[in-house]
Design a protein with these regions (language model features):
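Short, glycine-rich nucleotide/cofactor-binding loops
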Residues: 187
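P-loop NTPase Walker
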Residues: 1-82
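Accessory N-terminal region flanking or inserted into the helicase ATPase core
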Residues: 1-16, 23, 39, 102-181, ...
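Phosphate- and divalent-cation-binding pockets in alpha/beta enzyme and binding domains
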Residues: 52, 73, 172, 191, ...
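Catalytic micro-motifs at enzyme active sites that drive phosphoryl/nucleotidyl and oxygen chemistry
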Residues: 30-33, 144, 169, 196
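Conserved phosphoryl-transfer catalytic core
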Residues: 82-110
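Walker B catalytic acidic pair
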Residues: 184
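Residue-level recognition of alpha-helix termini/interfacial anchor residues
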Residues: 77-81, 92, 166
Length: 196
């Protein structure tokens, strides 16, 4: 199913305010009327857009979500798995090492490092790795490297790499949904578009 979804794309290009969201909502209604058993995923960029798409669609087999919320829901059950933690280290080990060393002598990093030492006793790569037993999504503009809390942007990048490494996650999407709609495509990260 995932392969079929990947090869069955329609792209609607139009300027802001031209009715793309209305078009998608009408398509959703049509599918619900003609194929009431269909399972539909509709993801968008903002909560406002998600709320707009949900109007008059209650009770249908439709999941409407923001991109970040959906991606987090998809991968969060695996945040404590060894393979996921290993991928985190593969991606962030160098950044963590540089932050520990604080070669730029950044005052904020210095304070952050001191706080970590006060909380955990020592600040080494090994200590950080041992203290991160599970990742999380922080809904913040920056990733908290020492705690495994992924930022708004890094969540999408991390999910992309995780799904590429473990394509079964993509199959979960394809097996669960007959249709996938992405609203606000122009605002969507390339990492997400690459997934779908």
């Amino acid at each position: 199913m995932a392969g079929k979804i990947k090869n069955n794309k329609d792209l609607i290009k139009a300027p802001a305010g031209s009715g793309k969201t209305t078009y998608i909502r009408n398509e959703l209604k049509s599918i619900c009327l003609n194929n009431p058993e269909s399972r539909i995923l509709c993801i968008t960029y903002t909560n406002r857009a998600a709320d707009e798409l949900k109007k008059n669609l209650e009770g249908a087999n439709i999941t409407v979500s923001t991109i970040h919320s959906y991606i987090n829901d998809l991968i969060s059950p695996f945040y404590s798995h060894k393979e996921v933690l290993d991928l985190y280290w593969e991606i962030y080990a160098e950044k963590i090492k540089n932050r520990i060393k604080n070669v730029t002598n950044d005052e904020n990093i210095k304070k952050s490092n001191q706080y970590y030492i006060e909380k955990y006793g020592e600040l080494t790569e090994k200590a950080v790795q041992e203290n991160i037993s599970e990742l999380s999504y922080g809904e913040t503009p920056f990733t908290s490297l020492y705690t495994g809390k992924l930022s708004h942007d890094d969540l999408l990048m991390f999910a992309n790499k995780l799904i590429k490494r473990y394509p079964i996650l993509l199959r979960k999407i394809g097996d669960k949904y007959n249709y996938i709609f992405i609203d606000e495509y122009q605002d969507t990260s390339a990492y997400v578009l690459d997934i779908f």
